[in-house]
């Protein structure tokens, strides 16, 4: 698929103000079978080019992209929804390939972390919970956008849901996401989190400001009903 075609297919056609707030272009390499419908290619050049086209197409439609899963999920050998997933490649390989794609998107206002263990960098903690990995995202990849976790209830993370939330925040994550709908778990997460830091507030405001700048100032409700068929 050409980048221009990717941009067209990423265009939600003026429904952003009602349906779409954010969307997550996946910038990982296509290696593992469970990723095959979710990635843009096998090489840095392909993923960066098609990812940028998708990113620009979303912006043009008033939808704020959330780049994911930082700093790269493609070389993982297992599905992180189901259990621990590791990447065994060297730091030198990763910084020139998987991580490099995210460096190409350092201008993004929002990103999502990967629940992946990178053995060459931090073999003990998945990137979401690893201060070392988050420091790489901030310093080496120059990403200063709002950084959120993937779903805390995924099986790749150790410990209880509340301890996962605390560890992510202490590692440097700005926002933790709990997505399975269990209200009791959500309450337990809310009870253990600290207040956002001033830097997190700054990143939030930058993301909100960028998002608000994309939203149409007026909305034709009749035209929207016709487009949705309701």
Range-by-range predicted roles:
Residues 46-59, 63-192, 196-202, 206:
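Second-shell residues forming the walls of enzyme active-site clefts
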Residues 14-15, 171:
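Structural motif
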Residues 194-230:
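Extended, intrinsically disordered, low-complexity segments
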């Amino acid at each position: 698929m050409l980048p221009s075609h990717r941009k067209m297919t990423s265009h939600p056609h003026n429904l952003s103000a009602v349906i779409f707030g954010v969307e997550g272009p996946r910038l990982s390499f296509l290696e593992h079978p469970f990723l095959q419908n979710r990635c843009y290619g096998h090489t840095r050049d392909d993923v960066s080019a098609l990812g940028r086209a998708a990113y620009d197409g979303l912006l043009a439609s008033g939808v704020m992209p959330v780049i994911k899963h930082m700093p790269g999920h493609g070389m993982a050998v297992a599905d992180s929804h189901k259990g621990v997933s590791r990447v065994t490649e060297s730091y030198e390989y990763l910084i020139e390939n998987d991580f490099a794609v995210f460096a190409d998107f350092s201008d993004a206002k929002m990103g999502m972390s990967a629940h992946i263990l990178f053995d060459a960098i931090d073999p003990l903690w998945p990137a979401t919970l690893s201060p070392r990995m988050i420091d790489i995202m901030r310093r080496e990849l120059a990403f200063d956008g709002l950084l959120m976790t993937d779903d805390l209830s995924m099986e790749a993370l150790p410990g209880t849901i509340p301890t996962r939330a605390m560890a992510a925040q202490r590692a440097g994550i700005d926002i933790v996401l709990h997505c399975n709908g269990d209200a009791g778990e959500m309450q337990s997460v809310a009870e253990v989190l600290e207040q956002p830091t001033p830097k997190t507030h700054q990143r939030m405001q930058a993301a909100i400001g960028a998002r608000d700048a994309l939203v149409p100032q007026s909305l034709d409700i009749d035209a929207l009903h016709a487009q949705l068929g309701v």
